[in-house]
Amino acid sequence: MRIKKIFITTTFDCNLRCKYCFEHNKTNLYIDVNKMQAILQKEFCDSGSYDLFSITFHGGEPFLAFEEIKKICEWTWKNYSNYNILFAATTNGTITNENIKTWLRQHKKHFNIILSIDGKKEYHNLNRGKSFDMIDFDFFLSTYSRPWVKMTVTPNTVEHMYENFIYLQQLGFNTNPTLACEIDWNEKTDLYKIKKELYKLVQYYISNPTERPGDLLSLPIEKLITNKDIYTTRCSLGSGYVAFDVLGNQYPCQNFIADFSKPYSAESINECVNLINQNDYRKITEICINCVIKEVCSPCYGLNYSNRASMGSVDKVWCYITKVLVYFNAYLIIKALTNGKQYIWLKDKSQIEIATLATAAKEIINLKNQLL
């Protein structure tokens, strides 16, 4: 399926001030509906034969601009009913009043929600203010079938990652634990805690074959084999991705918009796009050339650019974290392929793909001393 992914920043404003948020210098700018409708019209006309348009609203907190979202969605459904279009929003879930709830219920087949909840109340509130009790859990769980939750893990909650994951799973959410980016991880003490929690997550997925692993444990480790001596860019940016800020400025993806105070530079963004289109990671992240997992790793060019002014300026601690993640991905594959259970996330793979995964996993396990 060919998917066009469009990311729209509805506002630079947010009602929360999460400690780990990498979107800096929030302002009360909001999206212009007419301008965004014109942008979407062009995207639909120019995008060719895509099977699906996936349009995701970001913020800030996107539902601060609910009326704008509503107008854009209803205009799109009216004028492009012959297109397969799915909307979504990533939200903290704290401002969904009855008006928003009614609208979401009416359009739940065409408008998905990704909630930001970090686990139990005591751990969620550590980084997200006293916002836990502001979320209507019953509404989201009754409206959507196992709604997705992005559970952000930070140094002050990492040793409770598995505990918080299980808590949200048992509530009925589909939980995706992620490690916070662009914050101060300690490469010794925090890495040790990450390893312990990842081991528990692996055991969970091994014991629950109908559950699909989240982002931390679904890295494409087969690329260690399939991308050997291939130097394509390690990010999936390309013609299938585009992002727009509240002013309608275009970016390769939403992570290029992390600093809301930074003035837009079309020249700088065009340079990034041209470099990405050359499709050779060596021209972007030279530091990766001799890395043993370079085929698997996907450094975030957007966060590098928005936080350190260069797509090739990587967060060194994140390199250590990624090596740990790759190892535990391989460990999960080895366990899954040797215990005789049928895993939902493996059943659609061919025998050749399974064999490639197994080979890659074994090679990675043999690199244990370099990764851990």
Language-model regions, residue ranges each:
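Short metal-coordination and nucleic-acid-contact micro-motifs, chiefly zinc-binding Cys/His arrays
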Residues: F7-T10, C14, I284-I287, I293, ...
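Radical SAM/AdoMet-radical enzyme domain recognition
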Residues: I6, Q37-T56, A65-N186
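C-terminal accessory region of radical SAM enzymes
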Residues: K196-T226, Q250, Q254-P299, K335
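Cys/His-rich metal-chelating microdomains
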Residues: R17, C21-H24, F256, K294, ...
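Short, small/polar residue-rich loop motifs at catalytic or cofactor-binding pockets
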Residues: C235-G238
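Radical SAM enzyme core and accessory elements
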Residues: N290-L372
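Canonical Radical SAM [4Fe-4S] cluster-binding loop centered on the CxxxCxxC motif
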Residues: R2-N34
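Long, K/E/R/D-enriched contiguous segments that form extended
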Residues: M161-Y167, G172-K228
